[in-house]
Amino acid sequence: SHELKTPLTSISGYAELMQEGAVRPEDIRRFSGKIYDEAQRLIALVGDIIRLSQLDSRENLPPRVSTDLWELCETQLAHLEHAARKKAVSLHLVGDRVTVFGAEHILSEMVYNLCDNAIKYNKAGGSVTIELTALPDGAQLCVRDTGIGIPQEEFERIFERFYRVDKSHSREVGGTGLGLSIVKHAAAYHQATISVDSTLGEGTAITLHFPSPAADGFNTDLT
C-alpha cells in the first residue's frame, strides 16, 4: 500500500496547492511536472501489478512458441541504450544464437527487467553483459553486471515484491520494485530455474536456465 500511497499523496498535495491558488505562476509548470511524474510512476506500478496477477493466475497470458532469444535480447538492449548512456554503462550481448520455447512478450519483460536493474545499480564506467549459452538440455541466459553487488543473505529476498537491497536510494533509483518479482514468476511460467551469484562491490550475475521442450517433464501445454 505504501508504494501506491506515496505517489497519490504527492499528486493530491500538489493539486490541492494549485487548486487553492497557493502556487506562484512561475511554479505551476514545475508542480505540473511533479504531478505528471508521479502519475507515470502509478501507471508503471499498476501495469506491473496486473502482470504479476496474470502470471499468478496463468490467465490472459500469450502462448509459448519457439523464440529467437538472441534477437529478443538485441531488441531489449536497444530499448535500454539511452538509460545506459545516462549512467555511463556499456551494454554487451555475447555467446550463442539460441532459441527457447516461450512467450515473446513475457521473455522481453524478463530480459528488460534484469538489464534495467543491472543498469540502475551499476557504477559509472561499468558494464552489463547478456551471455547466451546453448546447452544439451536447453539454453542459458546470464545477465552480468559490474554494480554494487548483493549480500549473500539477501539472494532470495531480491525476488520479493517491493524488496530493495539499497533502500536508502529507492526513490533515486526509481522503478516499481516489482521487476525481479516479475522475472521470478515469468521464469516459473517458462519452467526455467534462476540462480544468483554476487560479490559486494564487484557485481552480480543472474542466470536463467530454460529447459528444452524435449526435456523430461517439460509441459508444452502449460497455461
Task: Go through each PLM region and give its residues.
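Short conserved segments within the C-terminal catalytic ATPase subdomain
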Residues: 83-93, 97
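Conserved micro-motifs of the catalytic ATP-binding
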Residues: 57-63, 95, 99-105
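Short alpha-helical segment of the dimerization/phosphotransfer core of two-component systems
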Residues: 37-42
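Short acidic helix/loop segment immediately C-terminal to the autophosphorylated histidine
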Residues: 19-26
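Short conserved segment of the HATPase_c
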Residues: 150-164, 184
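A conserved beta-strand-to-alpha-helix junction within the catalytic ATP-binding
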Residues: 63-81
